[in-house]
A protein has these predicted regions:
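Hydrophobic ligand-binding cavity/cleft-lining segments
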Residues: 1-45
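Short solvent-exposed loop/turn micro-motifs enriched in small/polar/acidic residues
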Residues: 3, 64, 94-96
């Protein structure tokens, strides 16, 4: 990994509003997560996400854990990003990565760009030297395929 950001993109047949509605509903995140680590939405996930929203997720990567996420970038139907930190005692050891979705209207649908930004992550240097960036890139590509299926199911 050369920089601190990995991005994947896909043109999804559907409007930016349709895609954004899915992204802004944290309770739906487990349905399109391509990594298999997002298990269940927790606190704060029942309301539509907006700038400053805080929501929790139950996760599992080997062992179960929880994350707390805060929406830090928001432009309705164009951009949503949240920063993740560990829940409980993990908040002191992990966190800071940003998950960002940019939506651009194009002919035939919406160009969706998902980015994993570790520039502020506490484990940035560890991640950069591991296989996690390559695994994350593959997982993000799967997530975009699942988002496409979800949008086109309506």
């Amino acid at each position: 990994m050369d920089g601190d950001v990995i991005s994947v993109e896909r043109v999804i047949p559907g409007s930016p509003g349709q895609v954004f509605d899915l992204l802004a509903d944290a309770s739906k995140h487990p349905t399109f997560d391509g990594s298999g680590t997002v298990k269940k939405a927790r606190s704060g996930a029942s309301e539509r996400l907006t700038l400053g929203s805080v929501f929790g997720m139950s996760m599992k990567l080997g062992l179960p854990y929880r994350t707390v996420n805060e929406v830090i970038e928001y432009d309705e139907n164009r951009l949503i990003a949240w920063q993740t930190r560990g829940g409980g005692l993990l908040k002191y050891a992990i966190g800071g990565r940003i998950w960002r979705y940019e939506l651009i209207p194009v002919q035939g649908g919406t160009l969706v760009r998902e980015s994993w930004d570790i520039s502020q992550d506490k484990l940035r240097l560890v991640f950069k030297r591991s296989s996690l960036p390559a695994m994350t890139e593959k997982s993000m590509a799967r997530s975009l395929k699942r988002i496409e299926r979800a949008v086109n199911a309506h």
